[in-house]
Amino acid sequence: MEPAHASPAIQDSRVPGRSRRRDLVEIAIAYGLILSVIWTPRPLQHLLWWAAAAVIALLVATSFEGCSAAGLGGRNFLRSLWVVAAALAVSAVAVAISSHLRTLHAPGSAWHFVTSYWAYALWSGVQQFLLQCFFLSRLLRLLPRPWQAALAAAGLFALAHLPNPFLVVLTILWGPLACLLFLRYRNLYPLAIAHAILGITIAIAVPGYVDHNMRVGLGYLKYHRGQRRAPQVQRSHSDHRASTVAWVTAAAPTLRSRIQARP
């Protein structure tokens, strides 16, 4: 018998009055808009950004099943805080290795750190909401097994990070784990916090020429053509409109530190 706190995750996926066709159409529309933004050059990309955001927000609003089903309540929050602790442990190891290799490029002060990454921290929560509460919730109704829905949602998440091999591998690892943890605890907050911790760790520990400033899609290819040598100064992501963190639009800034240590 499954633990009592795990079963509601499956039961909540059954919504009376919703058809499988509607779920499939909504997934296709949202994911198609995401990919169109990732692979469209500016200035058209800006228009698609707003179109994608508006359409996905409308789909979420018209199908919202409540805070509890979305993992926005307090249920199992304390039980799942170990996920945050695990992310902090991974981050500490990565930072230590990066410091040893002299690739660490964290902001020079706590204030600079907060101002550089607060937007990315919020965006991490948005990504997890869309992965778990939009795609996973619909795939749970389309596929016969929860683990199949978790793998399918994670697969969509990973494909949105092409052609960046570094980020595809990381999302293949994180995506299924995040989905399965959500199904077990049905609480989004620890996953969002862990996502922010791990993403910021990548931003400050991995040189930009390795992960192409965390770009995906057309932005990744343009970086590859235009900048082949290791940069001495890492620019903010705010001047790039094709970032890997754009699970919705691929355009939200990751705000990497402006100070890049030489490797």
Regions inferred by a protein language model and the residue ranges of each:
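Short, Lys/Arg-rich, polar N-terminal cytosolic tail immediately upstream
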Residues: 1-17
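Alpha-helical transmembrane segments in multi-pass membrane proteins
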Residues: 16-64, 79, 83
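Juxtamembrane "helix-exit" motif on the non-cytosolic side of transmembrane helices
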Residues: 36-41, 96-106
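Structural signal for the C-terminal ends of transmembrane alpha-helices
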Residues: 59-68, 97-98, 181-185
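Membrane-interface helix termini and inter-helical loops of multi-pass transporters
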Residues: 68-72, 99-111, 212-215
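Function-critical hydrophobic alpha-helical transmembrane segments in multi-pass membrane proteins
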Residues: 106-159
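Functionally important transmembrane alpha-helices
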Residues: 168-226
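N-terminal polybasic/positive-inside topogenic patches
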Residues: 229, 253-260
